[in-house]
């Protein structure tokens, strides 16, 4: 145990700092501080010694040099268990500093502001703070380093239970947290500066490249998993330090077994798909592919339509809703075997009802607009990085390329099918009618094979394709896919266009009296 007798507090984010400092003072801890933090403590009657008074050296260079002094860093880095360290510190009048409480200039918040000039960014790169954090973290055997306001209450509680001392285990945990903190901070600075053109001046907002020269990823482990995609693979789940709003990482598990690797991968696919719809929607996913999607007046109706698309594939799947789920919906869903149930919220009656299915994993995820900044795909020895596919085509962007003109209902169905196709593994073909998928063909090496599978799925489900529509995630390389679609009685097609055989494909649609629209963008998904 290390008794805390002297602390240095210098924080940018002052959340909770008064209460923490008062708690330290109540334990008889001498408090050193700088600038605005020292003023805040003094103004609120917390005993404090200015660092400049303690070191005998004034702050200078507009506050750039405050704590970079041997009396500060010697007091932090000195080892109490080495006689030569103790002797040298005594010789130079350097006292021990037992606790350092520091958080850093808000660099990321600064560069996130619209119009942030390079000069403003540079001025918000903390120097003294990280130096103290790293010094204290290195000497964790004798010094406690505090970088997170959330830790203040627990530390005061531990000191209260141990006559003002903190355990070795606590100090080590704080050290690990501190090094993670400075790594994330330096990573953000590196990402920013390596994306800025070297010849730009300090004034004005700099032009930044989308992809920095060096990409620093900061993630934190949520859990170790029993295994990965297969039982012989090891796995863990990590989330971003600051996950994008509305993403799966914000989930709250209400019940059920621990999420598996495949549960999380499939849940992400289901959630990303369902949250893209404005109307009440249900998405059922199996092996990261939608096997049923529908929009309707309410979640229960949407579920019934989505489930009807492919009752066989839905077995053991993931079911996601974009609206609060009630008891009636849970009762319907509970009639099938499922792995995970996801929604923004569940009524109390729904929670009570699903509790009987103890193995079902139930997740609440807030519906918010947001997407990951980057999508990452590992390849041998490297990483593919791209922006996410968040493009949703609008009615005004559609180009009718056939003699037949789509009706208003067909246009609505085409936009629905197109939105679904974005989440189906390529080659993707989606048949739909009335806000319901009627057949989904996924993941085939040839587009015509995906078309045939979608047709067979509709037939197996007993769903009529007469006057339904079809969506293709990429262009038709030949007319054969259109011919197969026509055989099903489908009346309209949506696809990107852009094939060297577009004219041949359009001619096939005209021969069959099918309306066809081009979107101008594709949705490959691998």
From Swiss-Prot:
InterPro entries: AICAR_Tfase_dup_dom_sf, Cytidine_deaminase-like, MGS-like_dom, MGS-like_dom_sf, PurH-like. The keyword Transferase applies. Residues 1-147 form the MGS-like domain. One of its GO terms (biological process) is 'de novo' IMP biosynthetic process. Belongs to the PurH family. This is Bifunctional purine biosynthesis protein PurH. Its EC number is 2.1.2.3, 3.5.4.10. SUPFAM superfamilies: Cytidine deaminase-like, Methylglyoxal synthase-like. The IMP cyclohydrolase activity resides in the N-terminal region. The gene is purH. The keyword Secreted does not apply. GO terms for molecular function: IMP cyclohydrolase activity; phosphoribosylaminoimidazolecarboxamide formyltransferase activity. It comes from Laribacter hongkongensis (strain HLHK9). GO terms for cellular component: cytosol. The lineage of its organism: Bacteria, Pseudomonadati, Pseudomonadota, Betaproteobacteria, Neisseriales.
């Amino acid at each position: 145990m290390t008794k805390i007798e002297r602390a240095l507090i210098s924080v940018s984010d002052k959340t909770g700092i008064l209460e923490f400092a008062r708690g330290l003072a109540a334990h008889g801890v001498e408090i050193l501080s700088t600038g605005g933090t020292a003023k805040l403590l003094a103004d609120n009657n917390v005993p404090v010694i200015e660092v400049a008074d303690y070191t005998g050296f004034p702050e200078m260079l507009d506050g750039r040099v405050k704590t970079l002094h041997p009396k500060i860093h010697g007091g932090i880095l000195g080892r109490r268990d080495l006689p030569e360290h103790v002797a040298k510190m005594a010789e130079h009048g350097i006292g021990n500093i037992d606790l350092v409480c520091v958080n850093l200039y808000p660099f990321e918040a600064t560069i996130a502001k619209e119009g942030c000039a390079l000069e403003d960014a540079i001025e918000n790169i903390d120097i003294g703070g990280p130096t103290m954090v790293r010094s204290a973290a290195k000497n964790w055997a004798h010094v406690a380093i505090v970088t997170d306001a959330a830790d203040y209450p627990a530390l005061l509680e531990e000191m209260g239970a141990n006559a003002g001392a903190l355990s070795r285990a606590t100090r080590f945990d704080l050290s690990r947290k501190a090094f993670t903190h400075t790594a994330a901070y330096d990573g953000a600075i590196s990402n920013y500066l390596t994306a800025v053109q070297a010849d730009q001046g300090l004034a004005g907002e700099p032009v930044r490249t989308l992809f920095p020269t060096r990409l620093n990823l900061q993630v934190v482990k949520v859990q170790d998993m029993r295994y990965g995609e297969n039982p012989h693979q090891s796995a863990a789940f990590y989330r971003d330090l600051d996950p994008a709003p509305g993403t799966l990482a914000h989930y709250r598990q209400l019940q059920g077994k621990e999420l598996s690797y495949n549960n999380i991968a499939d849940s992400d696919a289901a959630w990303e798909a369902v949250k893209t719809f404005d109307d009440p929607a249900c998405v059922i996913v199996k092996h990261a592919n939608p096997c049923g999607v529908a929009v309707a007046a309410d979640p229960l109706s949407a579920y019934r339509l989505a489930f009807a698309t492919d009752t066989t594939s839905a077995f053991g799947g993931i079911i996601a809703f974009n609206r609060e789920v009630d008891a009636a919906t849970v009762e319907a869903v509970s009639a099938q075997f499922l792995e995970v149930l996801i929604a923004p919220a569940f009524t109390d009656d729904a929670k009570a009802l699903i509790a009987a299915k103890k193995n079902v994993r139930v997740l609440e995820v807030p519906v918010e607009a947001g997407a990951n900044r980057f999508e990452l795909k590992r390849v041998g020895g490297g990483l593919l990085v791209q922006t996410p596919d968040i493009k949703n085509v609008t009615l005004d962007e559609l180009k009718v390329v056939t003699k037949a003109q789509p009706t208003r209902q067909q246009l609505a169905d085409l936009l629905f099918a197109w939105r679904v196709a974005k989440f189906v593994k390529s080659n993707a073909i989606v048949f739909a009618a009335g806000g319901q998928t009627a057949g989904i063909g996924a993941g085939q090496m040839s587009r015509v094979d995906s078309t045939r599978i979608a047709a067979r799925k509709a037939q197996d489900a007993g769903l009529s394709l007469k006057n339904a529509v079809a969506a293709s995630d990429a262009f038709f390389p030949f007319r054969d896919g259109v011919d197969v679609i026509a055989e099903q009685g489908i009346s309209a097609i949506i696809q990107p266009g852009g094939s060297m055989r577009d004219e041949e494909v359009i001619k096939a649609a005209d021969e069959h009296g099918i309306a066809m629209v081009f979107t101008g963008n594709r949705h490959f998904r691998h």
